């Protein structure tokens, strides 16, 4: 996973006024997300297929009922010919069951069980992707809210400075150009504030859309203690995180199931070399209109029972080809599993590296901000006393604004990187 925490896709919610926690947003999204719901449908279909594979062990029973009508030419005592009709009713009941087919039926059940497990892991993977998107969008809203607060504070401070500059201009203590510099700065910061407010609205809409929740202006989220989250770094290296991920990540489980299914498919193919043994049973009867029906049914009753063996002598190399394809299927599945493991390892390594880099960047941003705030405080005092012109003062203010922005970005990038580590370790995403 990359640390591009500011990118995401989104989903909608409900119109009740409440404060939504990250857990609330995730739970709602998992209930409403179309892909998750489609995964549920696939699971239901898979369950039907599994049950059918199990039911194939039992005998099949069929019944038939037929009515035959015929005519024949007859000559009476006067030598005249005519056609006489007759009818016959036949009924039969038959059943057959495969007693042995090279263990193919049992292996087909095992394969259906593997397929069902694969669908379960596929659903889990879909849910994890939705959860990750929601978490990313949620953090984006928190980031946008802080950006609005910072922009508003900056504009308020500049508004006070403009009032002070106006007083000093009236006293002739500063030039009109200095006053206009501060006024221009305020206008710029008000534009920045407007943009920040718009970005917050967009971030909220994005989150609601990801949740499949109708857009609601009253939608509000809970604000966790971000500082406490980043105060405790996850004590994990790439190797340990990878080992934990191997045990919990659904894509790994799915790849393992696919390999096992391919191995079972080989067993099914080998079963084609074995003879198959079937048991057949049936009974039939019939009657015509020429005699009483009850006696005919009794006298015409004909039960049957038989065993049949089918021995594959030569089938145009179909069994040989099936076995060969199954072996290659195992090789392909094993390579897919290896590729999935390697991909997971690379993602974990990148996530751990991102977390380490984010930690270093955050510390640097904190140091930059602390130095900038000290410099700004000194510059502000000088500006109020008239010992610094507006140009030099606004330079320090711009530096502080930049430091605040860098710190805010570094903080949320660090939070995201920590949560990604939790994600790979199988720890539920929450604040």
Predicted features and spans:
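N-terminal signal peptide c-region/cleavage motif recognized by signal peptidases
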Residues: 10-12
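Bacterial Sec-pathway N-terminal export signals of envelope proteins
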Residues: 15-62, 66, 215, 222-260, ...
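Small/polar, glycine/serine/threonine/aspartate-rich low-complexity segments that form flexible
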Residues: 17-18, 64-97, 224-234, 267, ...
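Sec/SRP-type N-terminal targeting helices
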Residues: 37-41, 54-55, 85, 99-127, ...
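Short segments within alpha-helical structural elements
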Residues: 41, 55, 191-213, 369-427
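Periplasmic alpha-helical coiled-coil/stalk elements that build and connect Gram-negative outer-membrane
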Residues: 123, 129-244, 354, 358, ...
